[in-house]
């Protein structure tokens, strides 16, 4: 009999909702007393989210979705300097609406003898701690990124108590962040920390982390032993549970994905030799300038490897590609729009991944043993790239501090060199490390593994009874 409920509040984007759903599935799989309610807020530019939720709702029988009503007064994205400040504003405005829904849930479930044991919120939804306080519910954070990011946030809260200035872009400052082995260049910090309103939003979030009952990170001891161990030894910080990697192995199709084209891509991959194809994909939010598209195309011609390049129509015009490029690479390369990334990374033909270093993409590539070339674009991806290259030695460096709106040109020769290195199957230290980590993290999520045990501990701490 199921008698325990958790209320999940994710940031309303597909990239955040997917790991939340998968974490819900893992919890229920490990303890069938648990059921989950997910509250869905509305965010500008995420109209396809409803389609996605409908596509997966039927496959999650113990998860229910409740839509939070739309805000009457909506902030506009252009009214702030940073996306992070805009999202923080949206979440704060949703607090009264969410409070009402949670109160209704508590009342209705109490009639059925079901206890709500806590709120589990996303990083940007930390302001929802006000709801938990008002009704005396435990408050947990599911951080869909890594432990290194959490260490940076812990450092930020501490620094702000001594120095309230924003970080200076393009400075040579090196930061000593507990939880990192190496000094961290300020240049790889999240973009928001270089502008006033973004910095303010991050500081508020960093302080709210310290008030949680516990923090779950989408990483594992095997991936980040130094950082995870740092938090295990912390006495004055909430409990940290390394429960990852968490992602959707079955990967529901994106609402904008052309399924016929998907079949063509997979058939093409089936015809390629093992580990012979480099996959290039820069996430759903990056927009590459025409000059960069040209450099990537030249780099792919120079390196001579087979390639699959995810390049959406809105990113490119015919003039952006070098004249005759498509004819010269015919048979050796493919360009597609939306791509089934998990299926592609799982395919035996794929031997390398040029990535924007979003954490979802990183854990997918590690799971399938595909080494990454780092080309961060926005948000915290520069920190992820630094973590992967310098801290963990699990990626090949193309760029660590590139930002999508900068004027920096990454030239074809740099791209060629990085691709050649990542695709080299002989004496490639990074490839060997990634293959080893792949086996370790797959074991970690099974019974007896470190991530499985971390979820068990979380369940025990929440419910008070072992699964």
Swiss-Prot record:
It is an enzyme of class 2 (transferase). PROSITE patterns: UDPGT. UDP-alpha-D-glucose binds at residues 144, 341, 356, 359-361, 364, 380-381. InterPro entries: UDP-glycosyltransf_plant (IPR050481), UDP_glucos_trans (IPR002213), UDP_glycos_trans_CS (IPR035595). It comes from the Eukaryota. GO terms for molecular function: flavonol 3-O-glucosyltransferase activity; quercetin 3-O-glucosyltransferase activity. The active site is at 16 (proton acceptor), 122 (charge relay). The keyword Membrane does not apply. An anthocyanidin binds at residues 16, 379. Signal peptide: none annotated. Keywords: Glycosyltransferase, Transferase. It catalyses: a flavonol + UDP-alpha-D-glucose = a flavonol 3-O-beta-D-glucoside + UDP + H(+). Pfam families: UDPGT. Its EC number is 2.4.1.-, 2.4.1.91. Possesses quercetin 3-O-glucosyltransferase activity in vitro. Belongs to the UDP-glycosyltransferase family. This is UDP-glycosyltransferase 71D1. It comes from Arabidopsis thaliana (Mouse-ear cress).
